[in-house]
Amino acid sequence: MEQFTIHTGLVAPLDRENVDTDAIIPKQFLKSIKRTGFGPNLFDEWRYKDVGEPGQDNSKRPLNPDFVLNQPRYQGASVLLARKNFGCGSSREHAPWALQQYGFRAIIAPSFADIFFNNCFKNGLLPIVLTESQVDHLFNETQAFTGYQLTVDLDKQVVVTPGGTAYPFDVTAFRKYCLLNGFDDIGLTLRYADQIKAYEAQRLAKMPWLAHKLVG
């Protein structure tokens, strides 16, 4: 998993409340057995005018010019600004996969659905909770100024505006440690690979029959 320390990026404002995971990545794209390739279908029903299906050539599909991610000024955005209860609905992990694979590194909102919030941390995506008034201010600035960027400093736990205003945010010590070091669940486990191997060797020495395969 990619480490997250300090990130400065263009902000895209998604001015909708209660964005659910089916809007983030529609159900038909969950058929894939891979965990890659979801970025092109992020917010599929909002980005395109037709109904998307897995395997389509998205370059030939009609775009919705009014949707924020299709507007030229927000191309290349890596910080998503959202409204309350972002990520509600089903618990599909494909939602943070799609957001990350599109290019987002952080999401700022007044609140998140709990399971989505947890899945973000497990996949290297930083969800940041700010107050509604702070989020309102960021929406106003993002929409008023083309090329509006924010700096997210995970170590200091602040979001910094171009004017130097710093908004502090909370994150648990464990989640912060994992993001700073790029550890997902597997990465955390592999830190103890030597101890695991030593335990398995010791266990098999005491109970060698466990190494035998059953026949029949």
Curated annotation (Swiss-Prot):
Species of the source: Ralstonia nicotianae (strain ATCC BAA-1114 / GMI1000) (Ralstonia solanacearum)
This protein's record includes keyword Lyase: yes
Protein name (record): 3-isopropylmalate dehydratase small subunit
EC number(s) per entry: 4.2.1.33
UniProt keyword Amino-acid biosynthesis present: yes
Reaction catalysed by this enzyme: (2R,3S)-3-isopropylmalate = (2S)-2-isopropylmalate
InterPro entries hit by this protein: 3-IsopropMal_deHydase_ssu (IPR004431), Aconitase/3IPM_dehydase_swvl (IPR015928), AconitaseA/IPMdHydase_ssu_swvl (IPR000573), IPMI_Swivel (IPR033940), LeuD (IPR050075)
Pathway listed: Amino-acid biosynthesis; L-leucine biosynthesis; L-leucine from 3-methyl-2-oxobutanoate: step 2/4
One BP annotation, GO: L-leucine biosynthetic process
Designated gene of the protein: leuD
